[in-house]
């Protein structure tokens, strides 16, 4: 972000884990809310040292607290517990639209959809044709970028920022689920660039470390 002068950050859902409010029974002790809240405050404080505009969308994990309280806690209640900064903006929506300043380009829909596919870009492709715009999709923990099936819209799976080796439901028992991978997207001048772990991204080039 500092290299490219990016001052606005959108966290598109699942900032929290909230396993304590999951409908699934836990097989290992869940992280307590006090610990999540404290960690959240530290992360947001550090992000605000650089970013001037921090925007949160809701993901399925964040909504666990809403469901636990039968909707009595809204997005301001939840995220208000980690920051009161006027640089922080929260939404109860699981998506937002970023207009494309290039008159020849389509807008970008950033979404934490409720759908999952084992095949990367499948959900993003369907959403692009439903909403007629470029898609940056979350929730599935894939990292990929391409065109929709008709080659009109750019479709992206944004990856995730979580260590899957620390997720009990992923690691304890064998399963045929897709793997997860780290990643994020930079949107600048109407163009999206995806970043992932090496060799998806040459981080020596990004950080100007030539050694």
Model regions: which residues?
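A short, hydrophobic/aromatic-rich structural module that often spans a beta strand
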Residues: 60-66, 112, 205-211
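Core catalytic region of metal-dependent phosphoesterases/phosphodiesterases
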Residues: 1-90
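Short, solvent-exposed secondary-structure boundary motifs
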Residues: 80-91, 168-178
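Conserved beta-sheet core of the metallophosphoesterase superfamily
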Residues: 107-196, 202, 208
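Short, basic, glycine/proline-bearing loop/turn elements
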Residues: 28-29, 102-112
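Short acidic low-complexity segments
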Residues: 87-104
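Flexible, charged surface loops at secondary-structure boundaries
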Residues: 1-5, 48-50, 83-84, 102-105, ...
